[in-house]
């Protein structure tokens, strides 16, 4: 069966799953593409619904849930090559995920700090994607919440998201803010993000990319050898991540472990977060200086009154897929 046939069959049976909480927009765009209603089953953060067939098309991140579905290590379901996937990039509905952001005020008041943090972080990402096995070990040693085997799987898959764009082309300029991919994300956000406040909804519809991103810091650090970044205005900074240490964020742990932050005059505190909402709030209210979130979450937060700006785009393509059992869709 083709992807279209599988999607239509699952949609009409009401067995397409997603977590919601801002993760659903690509799935809704995919369903719209095939003229199906945008309803989906609420999926928990295990793959048990996929396992017991209550969810026939289950949402999964390539670097996390898909690995658990396929592999037999601790926490895995051991489906191996008996599953298929539908990729949001291939379907033309990809939305960009992990970035680096801060407040506009922080960027204006601390430009050298932003450049130094970006320079060292991107150096960490460069090392991590070139040495994923070592990067996974570093993350594990920082207090991983998953097994060493899953960390290794995650590192390999995250490296693909950092080095490949939505069209499948290789990206060598880590942290690049691809205007086409960002515009597609913004356009889909305008179509599918629902905001209760009418003023916020109107603000969202009027956003341009320049309202939510600033490419100047990335451009400066990619042209630098590190010697011309200037003295950081703030030498001790913090970044809040979504979860406990794992390879989704390996670039920051590598930068910390290798001393890259020290080299640019920064002391960096990496804070384990509790999800995208707390992250945007923590950065906006000054609890932390930098955060990692999906681009759509930043857009929504700014529409709602926050004053955040993306300064680098780490993941160059969507990591979201729909996974299904081949046996369920074999003619």
Tell what function each PLM region has.
Residues 182-236:
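Conserved C-terminal helix/tail region of periplasmic/extracytoplasmic solute-binding proteins
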Residues 37-40, 78-83, 145-160, 195-209:
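Short, surface-exposed acidic
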Residues 43-145, 289, 296-297, 326-327:
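Pocket-lining segment of extracytoplasmic ligand-binding domains
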Residues 109-197:
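Secondary-structure end/capping motifs
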Residues 9, 19, 30-34, 49, ...:
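Structured segments of extracytoplasmic/periplasmic soluble domains
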Residues 1-42, 56-60, 86-87, 222, ...:
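Short, glycine-/small- and polar/acidic-enriched structural segments
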Residues 8, 12-13, 83-93, 165-179, ...:
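Short, solvent-exposed loop/beta-turn-alpha elements that line the ligand-binding surface or hinge
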Residues 3-4, 24-28, 47, 63-66, ...:
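Extracytoplasmic/secreted envelope proteins and their assembly/folding machinery
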């Amino acid at each position: 069966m083709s992807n279209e046939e599988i999607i239509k069959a699952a949609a009409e049976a009401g067995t397409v799953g997603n977590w919601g909480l801002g993760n659903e927009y690509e799935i809704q765009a995919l369903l719209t593409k095939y003229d199906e209603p945008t309803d989906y089953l609420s999926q928990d953060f295990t793959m048990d619904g996929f396992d017991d067939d209550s969810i026939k098309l289950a949402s999964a991140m390539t670097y996390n849930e898909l690995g658990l579905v396929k592999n037999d290590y601790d926490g895995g379901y051991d489906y191996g090559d008996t599953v298929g996937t539908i990729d949001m990039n291939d379907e033309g509905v990809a939305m960009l995920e992990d970035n680096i952001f801060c407040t506009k005020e922080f960027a204006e008041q601390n430009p050298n700090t932003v450049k130094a943090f970006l320079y060292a972080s991107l150096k960490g990402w460069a090392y991590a994607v070139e040495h994923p096995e070592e990067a996974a070990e570093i993350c594990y040693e920082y207090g991983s919440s998953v097994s060493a085997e899953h960390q290794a799987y995650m590192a390999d898959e995250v490296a693909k998201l950092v080095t490949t764009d939505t069209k499948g082309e290789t990206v060598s300029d880590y942290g690049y803010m691809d205007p086409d991919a960002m515009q597609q994300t913004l356009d889909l956000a305008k179509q599918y993000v629902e905001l209760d406040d009418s003023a916020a909804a109107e603000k969202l519809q009027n956003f341009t990319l320049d309202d939510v991103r600033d490419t100047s810091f990335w451009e400066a650090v990619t042209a630098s050898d590190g010697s011309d970044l200037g003295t950081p205005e703030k030498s001790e900074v913090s970044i809040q991540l979504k979860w406990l240490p794992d390879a989704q964020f390996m670039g920051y742990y590598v930068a910390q472990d290798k001393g890259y932050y020290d080299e640019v005059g920064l002391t960096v505190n990496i804070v384990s977060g509790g999800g995208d909402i707390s992250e945007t709030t923590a950065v906006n209210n000054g609890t932390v200086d930098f955060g990692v979130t999906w681009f759509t979450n930043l857009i929504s937060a700014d529409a709602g009154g926050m004053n955040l700006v993306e300064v680098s785009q780490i993941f160059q393509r969507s990591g979201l897929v729909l996974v299904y059992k081949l046996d369920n869709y074999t003619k």
